[in-house]
Structure formats: C-alpha cells, structure tokens
Amino acid sequence: MTEFWLISAPGEKTCQQTWEKLHAATSKNNNLAVTSKFNIPDLKVGTLDVLVGLSDELAKLDAFVEGVVKKVAQYMADVLEDSKDKVQENLLANGVDLVTYITRFQWDMAKYPIKQSLKNISEIIAKGVTQIDNDLKSRASAYNNLKGNLQNLERKNAGSLLTRSLAEIVKKDDFVLDSEYLVTLLVVVPKLNHNDWIKQYETLAEMVVPRSSNVLSEDQDSYLCNVTLFRKAVDDFRHKARENKFIVRDFQYNEEEMKADKEEMNRLSTDKKKQFGPLVRWLKVNFSEAFIAWIHVKALRVFVESVLRYGLPVNFQAMLLQPNKKTLKKLREVLHELYKHLDSSAAAIIDAPMDIPGLNLSQQEYYPYVYYKIDCNLLEFK
C-alpha cells in the first residue's frame, strides 16, 4: 500500500494558481510526487473559538478513527487467515481501492451534510465509528470463542498417541465391555520396545488374558495396543508397565460421550462456516464506512487548520501528494521553498528533530503549510 501527504496552501490570485505552482514544482523535479487536487466543499466556518477547540478534538478523532480502520483491517486478515491478496481484495472504500478513493475524493453530502456545523459533522463521524468499534468487539468475541472451541477439539484429535483423543481411533470390538471382572486397557508402546511388549505384557501382572493384545493404531514413534485383564490387577499392571516404558492411557469406552463430542465438533465446524460469510461481508462494509469516515476527518482537519492559519475569507487549495519514496527529503525541501514565506517562525525548519524533550507530535510535524499524512499501510502480516 502507500502513503499520501495532504497539504494546503493559501490561494494566490486564484486557488488554481496555487495548485499549478505546486504541480509544476513537484513534476519538474524528477517527479517528486504524483499530485492531485483534494476537493473540500464550502463548509460552515463558525467562530474562531469553536475552530480552536475543534482542532484539538479532530486530532483525537483522527487517531481514534484510524485505530478502528486498522482494527477492522487486521481482523479481516485474521478471519481470512492472512491470505494477503484475499485481504487486499476486500479492503475497498465505496467499491474502489483505497488509492483511487483518496485521489478522487468527493465529500459525501448524504452522510455528512455541509449545512451542518463542523462540530455536528465531527460528532456524526464519531458516533458512526464508535458504533463500528463496538460492533466489531462483540462480533469478534463471538467468532473467536467459536473458533477457539473448535481449535481445542481439533487439537485433542491431533498430536501423538500419548496425548491425543483416542475416541476417533478405537472401535467397540477392541474392548471387553460390561464385564464384572474383566477390563480392557489401552497402552502406548514405543516402537523400539514393541518386541519387549509382545514378550512381557502377559506377565506384567497376574490375571492378564493371554493373547489379548492387538495393535490398534500407530504414529511415528509408538503403537497403540489393547490388553484385557482382571479389574483387580489394573493398578499393579499400570505400575509394571510404566517401569518398562509402556504408558497406560486413561480411557473408558463410552459411546454416548464419543457421539456427543463428535456432534459438538460438527456443530462448531458448521457454525463457523455459517458465520464466516456474513462476518467477512460485515467487515468489508464497515471497513469501507470507517475508511471513508477517516478521510472525511482528514478533510475536516485540513479545512479547520487552513482557516486558523490563513484566515478569512476562506481561500486555500487542498492538495494531495503521493510522494516518491526515494526522494522524500527533496520533496520536503521543495515544499519548504514554496511555502516558507507563510510562517517566519518555520522558515529555518524543514524537519524538526525527533528527540527534543517535551516536543509533542503536532510540533514535530509542523511546517509552514498545513500538512497531514495518510498512511494506507493498514496491515501487519505475521
């Protein structure tokens, strides 16, 4: 994905001239950036006091909405299990890819009517995105619980014969059932010791039924064998078996329990499949909603900051730059030359040092022109 710089500068004789000047400066210098106009409608200005307060509120709203956008995108990646191409296909805004949406940005008059005050518009955005955030938490929690329960059951049916569930491996015929005196045990026998098992199992304790052991299953290291003996000899048999590196598994053949476990696994698997489609659709729709809201917050911030810096009547041009990554420093210098006259205190600053104690982010990124970054790198793939 990519990064944009959203900037504004005061209109020269016309706003078109401001735009042409920037475009010429960035294109003649080895194409430092792809530039386009960023269209912001005539919003209601309100009073200076309101604008100053709103400037701080919008900074917080910007960070909050960006956080929600990233959370929805990241959860989409989790649900699609990090299939990167598949995730990018679903991260759209208004049905188009994010770069297209930003570069062709048009204010959504229906969602955010410009007859409303700036504060009202920001509150509409905050309310909508808070709802998305809350819905995401509850949907993610429900889906994660389902997925976690299914994974726990699947984990039981995986792994070595020493730890995995044996219910899927054994059959009723492998056991002596409903006997008052006899019981069948399941024993994990290392492959290296299998010959010892055959020679010894009948004598590990008294009252072992001769020739009652068969191999029921195997994995890389071990065989699973059954053996039938008298109930009262079980403790002695377990003890002697352990001494000879044969491990008796705790297992009782119970058809009802095994059937219930299988049904539970099928139910969870079916529920997960049922929820997957609607969840991905919800994430897709609400990612779009949140991303659109985020770019509108950026537009509001540019508008408010431009009025505060450049004064009334409203006369500025908002412009979008997609910088060439190799020439970021050069682009900063060109912008500095173009706009340093706007603020004498910033005339000596191109990039504020990052390590001045007490310097907050807004000061770090202070330039003589209005500047906000839009970073579309929304995902962290594991």
Swiss-Prot record:
Coiled coil: none annotated. GO terms for molecular function: proton-transporting ATPase activity, rotational mechanism. Its main location: membrane. One of its GO terms (cellular component) is extrinsic component of synaptic vesicle membrane. InterPro entries: ATPase_V1-cplx_csu (IPR004907), Vac_ATP_synth_c_sf (IPR036132). Ubiquitous. GO terms for biological process: proton transmembrane transport; regulation of macroautophagy; synaptic vesicle lumen acidification. It holds the Pfam family V-ATPase_C. It is a peripheral membrane protein. It is found in: Cytoplasmic vesicle, Secretory vesicle, Synaptic vesicle membrane; Cytoplasmic vesicle, Clathrin-coated vesicle membrane. Keywords: Acetylation, Cytoplasmic vesicle, Hydrogen ion transport, Ion transport, Membrane, Synapse, Transport. Disulfide bonds: none annotated. SUPFAM superfamilies: Vacuolar ATP synthase subunit C. The modification N-acetylthreonine is found at residue 2. Belongs to the V-ATPase C subunit family. V-ATPase is a heteromultimeric enzyme made up of two complexes: the ATP-hydrolytic V1 complex and the proton translocation V0 complex. The V1 complex consists of three catalytic AB heterodimers that form a heterohexamer, three peripheral stalks each consisting of EG heterodimers, one central rotor including subunits D and F, and the regulatory subunits C and H. The proton translocation complex V0 consists of the proton transport subunit a, a ring of proteolipid subunits c9c'', rotary subunit d, subunits e and f, and the accessory subunits ATP6AP1/Ac45 and ATP6AP2/PRR. Subunit of the V1 complex of vacuolar(H+)-ATPase (V-ATPase), a multisubunit enzyme composed of a peripheral complex (V1) that hydrolyzes ATP and a membrane integral complex (V0) that translocates protons. V-ATPase is responsible for acidifying and maintaining the pH of intracellular compartments and in some cell types, is targeted to the plasma membrane, where it is responsible for acidifying the extracellular environment. Subunit C is necessary for the assembly of the catalytic sector of the enzyme and is likely to have a specific function in its catalytic activity. This is V-type proton ATPase subunit C 1.
